[in-house]
Amino acid sequence: MSRSGVAVADESLTAFNDLKLGKKYKFVLFGLNADKTSIIVKETSNERDYDVFLEKLPEDDCLYAVYDFEYEISGAEGKRSKIVFFTWSPDTAPIRSKMVYASSKDALRRALNGVSSDIQGTDFSEVAYESVLEKVSRGAGSH
């Protein structure tokens, strides 16, 4: 339960574990239910194109997401995969929505074991592939 009184629905944990352990999904989008009491799964996808993920982020509302982010490391290290947690809170979202999402984030984040990076996005430049790549690849060899 978060400071805002919002709980994490079991389906959210199940979807996350399906992404993390079962590699069933490439990304999962989470949001609040209609009465803003629970964090639920809004959508799951196995689409590998990062741009498809970005298109799912609303221009005028908040959401959370986890993405199985794959990238290459130069040299012999090859491909890496890291699970990234996104808090999407665009400047154009309603203030009330931003407040509830901000105060509920920790409950979801603590429930998702195995996330390696957190990205806070208020505009698309902050969640662009290159921006995320720079953050997740720090300390993982040169890129």
Curated annotation (Swiss-Prot):
One of its GO terms (cellular component) is actin cytoskeleton. One of its GO terms (molecular function) is actin filament binding. One of its GO terms (biological process) is endocytosis. Residues 5-137 form the ADF-H domain. It is found in: Cytoplasm; Cytoplasm, Cytoskeleton; Nucleus matrix. Keywords: Actin-binding, Cell cycle, Cell division, Cytoplasm, Cytoskeleton, Nucleus. It comes from the Eukaryota. The keyword Cell division applies. SUPFAM superfamilies: Actin depolymerizing proteins (SSF55753). Controls reversibly actin polymerization and depolymerization in a pH-sensitive manner. It has the ability to bind G- and F-actin in a 1:1 ratio of cofilin to actin. Binding to F-actin is regulated by tropomyosin. It is the major component of intranuclear and cytoplasmic actin rods. Required for accumulation of actin at the cell division site via depolymerizing actin at the cell ends. In association with myosin II has a role in the assembly of the contractile ring via severing actin filaments. Involved in the maintenance of the contractile ring once formed. Belongs to the actin-binding proteins ADF family. This is Cofilin. The lineage of its organism: Eukaryota, Fungi, Dikarya, Ascomycota, Saccharomycotina. The gene is COF1.
